[in-house]
């Protein structure tokens, strides 16, 4: 392909094309049917100096993550020596701007194609690289009071950055600063800086230029092979004659090209992008969605330096790839390592740089199956269910009250207790679980038997004293899933999974998930007495955070029926009998529906069908 010097515009049958018949069907689907628009637009007088200039310098000014020129037009170089945490996470909004300076001097204003002036702002999320782009933008949009369109989203070192184009949007994003918690319960910082217009806006092709590009691409398309040849596109004679500068390593030009492909030939099978001075493939990444059937891709003669660039298009199911002439080809010690690295991204590849590859080693792997959903609590019998739920309700009412000393009666004289948190290779003492670290008895991390023994809390006095030192909490009773794993006439073992919120200290309002395993024996008051208590605490997942405290638990009261009229008390008794819920939850349901019995019954039926009424509501 590349080594034969083949050019698709040598074919005579590509000058005119059939009209687009149906989206995604037919040999060619160009919308453009206009005649030659080039008359009167430059004729034969060509600015040859444009092509004689150094292409590399022009292109490099638009490559945001190229070395030495990463978005330097948009912000001053930070003072690394005097940098500190507060300065790096502080919001910077330079509003209002001085009116005695021109837009060019301020660097924050631009002009749209309709002549209106716009202010541009660069949005920076420190350490944003660790977040998925879709998740990050969606969560910011959900908290932002103004809908916004992120322009040129990209990662810069450890930061995530994008641009917005007006002051009201920037102010709304400023208000979101530190309002978002990530999956590790860390607050996300958002920094706003005034900025010059992003390159994709500065170099955006005009509508008439896009139409000309579409016509030229149609001439380079071979409908019989569903192949598009964009080799050395900037030097195309028709583009030069029209004085249209299409540099494919500019985000705006690549975006326009891919948009034309998506709208006209999404069934494309072969694409030649050789000799276009491509330094990175960020802007090509959307081709995975816009031309999902692509099988042949020619990237030879470009300036790709790292194999990691291929990760950005590895969603393509390529069978043939050309990379020769790129610096990355020289970074491998031998041919087999090169083939292996490429095939890691494209496992179905059959030809590389024109050479046949040995058949890929494949395994018969069963189709992925979805794990069954987690079931609810398991109690074994109704008697055990009532016993355990009553115990948990009493236990966590005291545990969350702020005075855990009253838990002494819940523990056996010889009880023992331990705590553990997840093992992480990073320094856990500096994580947001740091308050639990010193008492963690994670045996995967802890090898010293003496220390293991010391971290076990023995006797009920030591156990309750230890529990008093842990952060104050509020548990979401509705999140509890209880499983009874063992039961004899003299012993009961059960586990509780759920979420809680810390209500004071450095991690106030942080959500945690926990698993707690109790081993208990019968108590003299027909209740339970704990002999072993094992607590595991971790950060709550995104789903757990979203579901937490969705249905507030009723406030415990000393009287189940406080100050109700005789009619309300009669209604409450009837509703409790028919629904099966206890008086406390029945009253809550009636109150939430303004004591309308019919509405309350409908709400109860609806929530019960969805499984959103907790077990404790039925404990009498």
UniProtKB/Swiss-Prot annotation:
GO molecular function, one term: RNA binding
Subcellular compartments: Nucleus, Nucleoplasm; Nucleus speckle; Cytoplasm; Nucleus
Start and end residues of each stretch annotated as Major non-specific RNA-binding: 60-119
TAP-C domain span: 566-620
Domain NTF2: start-end pairs: 387-537
Biased amino acid composition, Basic and acidic residues: 1-15, 49-59
Family: Belongs to the NXF family.
Protein name: Nuclear RNA export factor 1
């Amino acid at each position: 392909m590349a080594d034969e010097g083949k050019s698709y515009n040598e074919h005579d049958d590509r000058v005119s094309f059939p009209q687009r018949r149906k989206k995604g069907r037919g040999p060619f689907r160009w919308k453009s049917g206009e005649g030659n628009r080039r008359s009167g637009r430059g004729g034969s007088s060509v600015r040859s100096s444009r092509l004689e200039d150094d292409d590399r310098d022009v292109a490099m000014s638009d490559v945001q993550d190229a070395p030495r020129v990463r978005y330097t037009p948009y912000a001053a170089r930070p003072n690394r020596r005097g940098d500190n945490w507060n300065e790096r996470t502080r919001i910077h909004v330079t509003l209002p701007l001085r009116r005695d300076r021109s837009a060019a001097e301020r660097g924050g204003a631009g002009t749209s194609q309709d002549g209106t002036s716009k202010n541009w702002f660069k949005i920076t999320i420190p350490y944003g690289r660790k977040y998925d782009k879709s998740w990050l933008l969606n969560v910011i949009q959900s908290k932002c009071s103004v809908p916004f369109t992120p322009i040129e989203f990209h990662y810069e070192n450890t930061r995530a950055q994008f641009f917005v184009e007006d002051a009201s949007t920037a102010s709304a994003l400023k208000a979101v600063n530190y309002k978002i918690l990530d999956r590790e319960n860390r607050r996300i910082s958002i920094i706003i800086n005034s900025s010059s217009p992003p390159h994709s806006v500065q170099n955006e092709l005009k509508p008439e230029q896009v139409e000309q590009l579409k016509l030229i691409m149609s001439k380079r398309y071979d409908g019989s092979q569903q192949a598009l040849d964009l080799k050395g596109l900037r030097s195309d004679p028709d583009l030069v004659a029209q004085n249209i500068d299409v540099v494919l390593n500019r985000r705006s030009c690549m975006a326009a090209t891919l948009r034309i492909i998506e709208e006209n030939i999404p069934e494309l099978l072969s694409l030649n992008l050789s000799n276009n001075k491509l330094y990175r493939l960020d802007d090509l990444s959307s081709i995975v969605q816009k031309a999902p059937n692509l099988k042949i891709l020619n990237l030879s003669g470009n300036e790709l330096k790292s194999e990691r660039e291929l990760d950005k298009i590895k969603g393509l199911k390529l069978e043939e790839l050309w990379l020769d002439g790129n610096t990355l080809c020289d970074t491998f010690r031998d041919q087999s390592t090169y083939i292996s690295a490429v095939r890691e991204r494209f496992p179905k590849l059959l030809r590389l740089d024109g050479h046949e590859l040995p058949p890929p080693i494949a395994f018969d792997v069963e189709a992925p199956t979805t794990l069954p959903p987690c079931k609810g609590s398991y109690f074994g019998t109704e008697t055990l269910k009532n016993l355990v739920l009553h115990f948990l309700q009493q236990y966590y009412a005291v545990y969350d009250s702020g005075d855990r000393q009253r838990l002494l009666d819940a523990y056996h004289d010889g009880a023992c207790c331990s705590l553990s948190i997840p093992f992480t290779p990073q320094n856990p003492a500096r994580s947001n679980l740091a308050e639990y670290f010193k008492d963690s008895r994670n045996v995967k991390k802890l090898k010293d038997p003496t220390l293991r023994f010391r971290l076990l809390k023995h006797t009920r006095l030591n156990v309750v004293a230890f529990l008093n030192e842990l952060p104050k909490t509020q548990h979401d009773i509705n999140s509890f899933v209880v499983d009874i794993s063992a039961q004899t006439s003299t012993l009961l073992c059960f586990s509780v999974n759920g979420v809680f919120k810390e209500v004071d200290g450095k991690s106030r309002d942080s959500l945690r998930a926990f698993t707690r395993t109790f081993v208990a024996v019968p108590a003299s008051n027909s209740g339970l007495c704990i002999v072993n208590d094992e607590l595991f605490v971790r950060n709550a997942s995104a789903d757990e955070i979203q579901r937490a405290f969705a249905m507030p638990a009723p406030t415990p009261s000393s009287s189940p029926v406080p100050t109700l009229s005789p009619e309300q008390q009669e209604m409450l008794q009837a509703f409790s009998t028919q629904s099966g819920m206890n008086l406390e939850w029945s009253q809550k349901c009636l109150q939430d529906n303004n004591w309308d019995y019919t509405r309350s019954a409908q709400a109860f039926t609806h929530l019960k069908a969805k499984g959103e009424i907790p077990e404790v509501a039925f404990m009498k």
